[in-house]
């Protein structure tokens, strides 16, 4: 009997989101692609909350753009090697909530396709990226508040220092996912929407 996958695939077609994983290209703070693929996964509980967030955003005539979700341990190690900054980058020795599949990085997109101005790019590791940084203009603060409202209503918690990062409550109680074993299961799972991309 085939084991059930510990994470669920997130796709634009199945979840009505936009997906642009920032670590699948060199356009991130490391200057190189960290992922070998562009597959997006979440823990089932986080996936259920994401669906609620999608519905909440739709009521505001907005869409969610997913920038990162499940992150393999080796990817976390690569990020830490470049920026060992607790509070912004999780120490891989302790484990990232992304590696548990219960954290997601994302932003909002307007009906015209424009990404809302959040004041800083993702992975800006300064005070300006903090959720309630007072130095941003009113429009930026409103946009961040919209994202916060959508995600809190869906059951996520925010990261005080990263406006883009949300995670399940008690996230660190979830087990870390063995990425090699997981991706092997994905490749073998003929029913997974992600299988064709592996």
Regions found by a protein language model. Name each.
Residues 1-69, 81-198:
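Extracytoplasmic cell-surface/polysaccharide-interacting catalytic and binding patches
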Residues 72:
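Segments that shape or occlude catalytic/ligand-binding pockets
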């Amino acid at each position: 009997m085939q084991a059930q996958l510990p994470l669920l695939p997130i796709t634009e077609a199945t979840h009505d989101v936009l997906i642009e994983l920032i670590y699948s290209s060199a356009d991130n703070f490391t200057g190189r692609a960290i992922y070998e693929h562009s597959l997006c996964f979440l823990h089932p509980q986080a996936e259920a909350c994401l669906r609620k967030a999608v519905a909440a955003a739709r009521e505001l005539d907005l869409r969610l753009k997913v920038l990162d979700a499940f992150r393999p341990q080796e990817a976390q190690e690569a990020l830490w090697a470049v920026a060992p900054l607790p509070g912004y980058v999780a120490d891989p020795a302790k484990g990232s909530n992304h590696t548990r599949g219960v954290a997601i990085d994302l932003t909002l997109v307007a009906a015209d396709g424009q990404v809302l101005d959040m004041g800083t790019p993702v992975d800006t590791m300064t005070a300006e990226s903090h959720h309630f940084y007072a130095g941003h203009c009113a429009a930026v603060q409103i946009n961040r508040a919209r994202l916060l409202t959508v995600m809190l209503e869906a059951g996520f918690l925010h990261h005080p220092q990263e406006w883009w990062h949300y995670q399940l409550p008690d996230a660190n109680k979830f087990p870390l996912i063995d990425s090699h074993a997981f991706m092997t299961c994905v490749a073998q799972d003929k029913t997974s929407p992600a299988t064709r991309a592996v």
